[in-house]
């Protein structure tokens, strides 16, 4: 089997994908790309605005195009949005074109990490954000597990420690 050179980070919002991804890219001297940031740059608008104007469907279409394009690059660490796995096409591209790492976290930790963040459209203007996170986990966690080459809980470790663990696990995967 040819060695997979890309590393794709998946998992729920607040799992640390972007923070860990930056550390990982630095350790491996690879480019770091965040699919949500890429969508915002190309749209010239933030994700909340895209959700407001185009709805979640419009956002997901943009996300599919971006993930298809980004996963064709070589030597990148890609942090995906929490809902990227909802698309079968995204799951196929991610699992076929790189090492998929599922950064797992508890709903409680997610809630702590996201409660002051105003850039999470699915958590805005809802009565019970914790319940929304629970509902999302029920749908998305099995999809994360379906395509993950490696699963790592992120609740207790710093981003730097997590990035180092990922490097070791990838070395073992290909050792």
Swiss-Prot record:
Pfam families: SKI (PF01202). Its main location: cytoplasm. InterPro entries: P-loop_NTPase, Shikimate/glucono_kinase, Shikimate_kinase/TSH1, Shikimate_kinase_CS. It catalyses: shikimate + ATP = 3-phosphoshikimate + ADP + H(+). Binds 1 Mg(2+) ion per subunit. Mg(2+) binds at residue 18. One of its GO terms (cellular component) is cytosol. ATP binds at residues 14-19, 120, 157. It is found in: Cytoplasm. Substrate binds at residues 36, 60, 82, 140. Coiled coil: none annotated. Its cofactor is Mg(2+). GO terms for biological process: amino acid biosynthetic process; aromatic amino acid family biosynthetic process; chorismate biosynthetic process. SUPFAM superfamilies: P-loop containing nucleoside triphosphate hydrolases. Its EC number is 2.7.1.71. Monomer. Belongs to the shikimate kinase family. Catalyzes the specific phosphorylation of the 3-hydroxyl group of shikimic acid using ATP as a cosubstrate. This is Shikimate kinase. It comes from Pasteurella multocida (strain Pm70). The gene is aroK.
């Amino acid at each position: 089997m040819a060695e997979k050179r890309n590393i794709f980070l998946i998992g729920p919002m607040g799992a640390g994908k972007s923070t860990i991804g930056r550390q990982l890219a630095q350790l491996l001297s690879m480019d770091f790309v965040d699919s949500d940031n890429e969508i915002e740059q190309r749209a010239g608008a933030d994700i909340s605005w895209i959700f407001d104007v185009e709805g979640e469907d419009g956002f997901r279409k943009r996300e599919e195009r971006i993930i298809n394009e980004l996963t064709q690059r070589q030597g990148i660490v890609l942090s995906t949005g929490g809902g990227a796995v909802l698309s079968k096409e995204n799951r196929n591209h991610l699992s076929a074109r790189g090492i998929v790492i599922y950064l797992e976290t508890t709903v409680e930790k997610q809630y702590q990490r996201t409660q002051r963040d105003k850039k999470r459209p699915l958590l805005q203007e809802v009565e019970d954000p914790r319940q929304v996170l629970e509902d999302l986990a029920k749908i998305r966690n099995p999809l994360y597990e379906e395509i993950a080459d490696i699963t790592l809980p992120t609740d207790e470790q710093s981003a730097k420690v997590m990035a180092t663990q990922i490097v070791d696990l990838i070395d073992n995967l290909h050792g």
